[in-house]
């Protein structure tokens, strides 16, 4: 197994610091909405859905723009991380769910600007045979930062006596450290000549194999509603704030535990095989979520869900990196983020509405069904072709 490039390692630690900052805040949002602002599951679904969809529109633009500039991607990554880490701490002053929505939107705009160019930086620096490993490593450190963030928030709340608002403000410290590490530690490849005029952006011009994969991903994204609903479920079951932060930490630790191994496995046996396993287990975990009625059960299922989720993270992104031309990696990742993110609004509203007007169990059961459908379509409609000399682990799909 080849060594990971320095760029991939540094970007991994940038994500670790950024997620440390982010996850000091994100698991507190459903608690903030429920206890301070008095908003319900539909508001939570709308906030998370709108924020993710807005980010996704920008991900396609930023990825495509970084391609047009000859692979100049770092400026987009730095700008995006900076915006997010200036906007997030202001949630400490939010007094209405509309303000929470606005600030989450600014946070996600930053994510939208940085994500596709950052993923393309990883692709630019990595040889094809270790792409799954590279993305799995990156996701593992990202999830490791999420573990650390929620643990830091729990420790501060438990032992310092500071209110939630001050914990949120403290997140600016690791966030700005992430920006500094990226600005000083990543050196991108020498840029190619800028493209004076990009071809029109049309979904019809996307290769059929990629369109099929994106369609399946969109269905899976409908199942993958915001994980803050797991926190809300714990709150409804009577868990206290510190316990919920520890639960969030356990979720992300479970993701980190399988992310790198899942990426390596995808490089060996094929990305589609790993995705099929991960998505099937994901559907099973949501069936379990619908049946639990105790805090202990929630802990067990949350850890199981995290292990399943982490298993497929590296494979999902490594697959995308194989589809576009080397000069259009940013655009390929932009399409990926756009499709997944645009599903976030209807997914969040559907999940929140089922939760509020039917039951939490119904919301989880519907999500499980959608995940199972995505796994089935991956196998029967968008499965990799072994023709055409694709390398082992390649996920080129049949036209």
Named regions from a protein language model:
Residues 172-194, 374-382:
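C-terminal membrane-cytosol helix-exit motif in multi-pass small-molecule transporters
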Residues 57-95, 266-272:
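Conserved MFS/SLC helix-loop-helix module at the cytosolic interface between two early adjacent transmembrane helices
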Residues 2-52, 211-247:
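Helix-loop boundary and gating motifs at the non-cytosolic
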Residues 46-64, 249-261:
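Central cavity-lining transmembrane alpha-helices of secondary-active solute carriers
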Residues 31-36, 148-168, 346-362:
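Transmembrane alpha-helix termini and helix-breaking/packing motifs in multi-pass membrane transporters
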Residues 113-126, 311-324:
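Intracellular juxtamembrane helix-capping segments at the cytosolic ends
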Residues 1-5, 188-217:
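Juxtamembrane intracellular "pre-TM" segments in multi-pass secondary transporters
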Residues 75-89, 172, 273-288, 368:
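Structural signature of the two symmetry-related core transmembrane helices
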